[in-house]
């Protein structure tokens, strides 16, 4: 997936309204069964209002933005995978697409999605000996994300009061943890779960994720 397509998917699925369902942007999950509404240019023009409204209700995110401006960087995977940030993204997506999910429903989605991410990291470590290092996430962002400078991305960064660098390397950093994890895991999971006769690459890729995540149960 190209950097531009990756960011577009992130915006369309802003909060994993099923939880990447990352709401949407679930690199390590195949539960995206619900069709997501596509955002229009007009929707993006409302980004600032949508973000501002949610920030008023979630002071924790405002505090994180302030820490970013002060140069503080979360240095642990557990800190990166925040339920509050997942909930923030879901609520922004909810506002942009004019949906009417309750706060309780959106919080539950955020908790589920974040829990899946944490479990995926645990299974990768315990079953495959795979860990994700901060340096690997930084390198992934440098190669695949930082070069994307679309209008939508700039609008989002401005709505948050961040530079593109702060958005990519700090605020949205958690998005890319699972990308790095899956890149490292794929060869190992493929050895354990071979491709079936007649199975398409897409179907195989989705099945790999499903069967890997089943190990979390």
Q: What do the predicted segments below correspond to?
A:
Residues 2, 20-69, 157-217:
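PPIase-associated folding chaperone regions across multiple families
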């Amino acid at each position: 997936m190209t950097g531009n397509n990756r960011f577009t998917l992130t915006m369309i699925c802003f909060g994993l309204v099923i939880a990447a369902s990352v709401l949407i942007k679930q690199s390590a999950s195949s539960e995206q069964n619900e069709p997501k509404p596509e955002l229009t240019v007009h929707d993006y023009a409302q980004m600032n209002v949508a973000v501002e409204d949610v920030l008023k209700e979630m002071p924790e995110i405002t505090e994180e933005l302030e820490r970013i401006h002060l140069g503080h960087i979360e240095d642990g995977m557990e800190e990166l995978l925040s339920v509050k940030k997942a909930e923030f993204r879901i609520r922004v997506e909810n506002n942009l697409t004019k949906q009417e999910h309750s706060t309780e429903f959106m919080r539950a989605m955020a908790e589920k999605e974040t829990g899946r991410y944490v479990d995926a990291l645990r299974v990768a470590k315990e079953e495959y000996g795979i860990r994700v290092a901060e340096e690997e996430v930084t390198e992934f962002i440098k190669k695949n994300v930082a070069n994307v400078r679309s209008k939508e991305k700039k609008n989002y960064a401005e709505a948050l009061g961040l530079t593109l660098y702060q958005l990519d390397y700090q605020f949205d950093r958690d998005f890319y943890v699972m990308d790095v994890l899956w890149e490292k895991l794929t060869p190992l999971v493929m050895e354990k779960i071979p491709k079936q006769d007649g199975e398409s690459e897409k179907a195989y890729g989705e099945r790999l994720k499903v069967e890997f995540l089943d190990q979390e149960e």
